[in-house]
């Protein structure tokens, strides 16, 4: 089965929050559209495809003001979403939604250089009744995302009503998410709150950073589960949903996520005086999600155990600590 998603105008609308007043238009849009490069955005602006309210914007450096309604219109490339028989564990499914356990190494949806092997491809094969269209041509059914090398529970909408109501819950921060994360070094406080705005790195565009281009509020709560000789195991609860948020927050404290070379984790892990090990993925796992059913309002909660690769790594660390 395949779904041909024809070329069409992709319309995205944003309202400028108070803390973005005075920011350059291209910088603001860069923070809102991580799937676009800044050069692409600048071409779109100069082509007159961006509106501020009812007025056409053509200057990339124009300053935006709180309350401005910005509309971006562009023609995306034609995308074909093809159902693929990929391994996928479905934790729950009904007529409105599904909850699945995404493996590490699987992208959520198509993007630059990735046209197959994604979660969307797997969903089209395994789920009955289709996916919502609100997510657009690239992201049918996708209400929120997990990074490619992050595993765990992810929520999917099967119709537009469910998608909008679930998206509203994410926007109001009423969805509870808990991650298990192993970081380098000893995190001193047993529990804490990291509050640092996150934006795109102006030099390394694939990365985010504290501050950066068009930074947005980002808050992560954490609790120490266990300390090892060289690592700390944590439960992390993001209160906001910024790209790479947990990874960026802990890297900014000099505690990068184990296996996360993009944000400074070493390739070889020190696990003993003379011993080194490697981990072929980030030690970041979406362990739990809790939300209200979009149709009934009932509270729903789903969990995912640590994947065997991560559980085995923890067992190895425990043996080293004895």
Regions found by a protein language model. Name each.
Residues 1-202, 283, 306-318:
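RNA pseudouridine synthases
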Residues 1-40, 203, 212-213, 219, ...:
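Pseudouridine synthases involved in rRNA/tRNA modification
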Residues 54-56, 229, 234-236:
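Short histidine-centered loop motifs in beta-beta connectors
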Residues 90, 183, 221-224, 257:
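Conserved hydrophobic positions within beta-strands
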Residues 91-92, 199, 223-226, 237:
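Well-ordered beta-strand positions
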Residues 166, 242-250:
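Short beta-strand segments enriched for Tyr within beta-sheet-rich domains
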């Amino acid at each position: 089965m395949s779904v041909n998603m024809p070329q069409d105008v992709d319309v995205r609308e944003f309202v400028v929050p108070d803390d973005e007043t005075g920011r350059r238009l291209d910088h603001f849009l860069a923070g809102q559209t991580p799937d676009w490069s800044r050069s692409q955005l600048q071409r779109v602006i100069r082509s007159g495809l961006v509106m501020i309210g009812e007025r056409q914007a053509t200057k990339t450096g124009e300053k935006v003001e709180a309350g401005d309604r910005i509309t971006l219109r562009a023609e995306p490339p034609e995308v074909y979403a093809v159902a693929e028989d990929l391994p996928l564990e479905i934790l729950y499914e009904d007529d409105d939604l599904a909850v699945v356990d995404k493996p590490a190494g699987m992208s959520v949806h198509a993007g630059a250089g990735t046209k197959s092997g994604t979660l969307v491809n797997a969903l089209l094969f395994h789920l009955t009744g289709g996916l919502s269209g609100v997510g657009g041509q690239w992201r049918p059914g996708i209400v929120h995302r997990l990074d490619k090398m992050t595993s765990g529970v992810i929520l999917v909408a099967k119709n537009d009503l469910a998608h909008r109501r679930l998206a509203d819950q994410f926007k109001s921060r009423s969805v509870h998410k808990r991650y298990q994360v192993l970081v380098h070094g000893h995190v001193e406080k047993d529990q804490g709150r990291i509050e640092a705005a996150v934006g795109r790195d102006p030099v390394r565009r694939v990365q985010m950073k504290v501050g950066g281009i068009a930074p947005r509020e980002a808050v992560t709560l954490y609790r120490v589960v266990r300390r090892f000789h060289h690592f700390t195991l944590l439960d992390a609860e993001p209160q906001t949903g910024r790209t790479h948020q947990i990874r960026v927050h802990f890297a900014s404290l000099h505690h990068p996520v184990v296996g996360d070379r993009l944000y400074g984790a070493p390739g070889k892990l020190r696990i003993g005086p003379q011993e080194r090990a490697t981990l072929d993925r980030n030690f970041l796992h979406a362990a739990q999600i809790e939300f209200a059913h979009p149709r009934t309002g009932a509270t729903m909660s789903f969990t995912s155990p640590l994947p065997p690769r991560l559980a085995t790594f923890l067992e190895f660390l425990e043996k080293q600590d004895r």
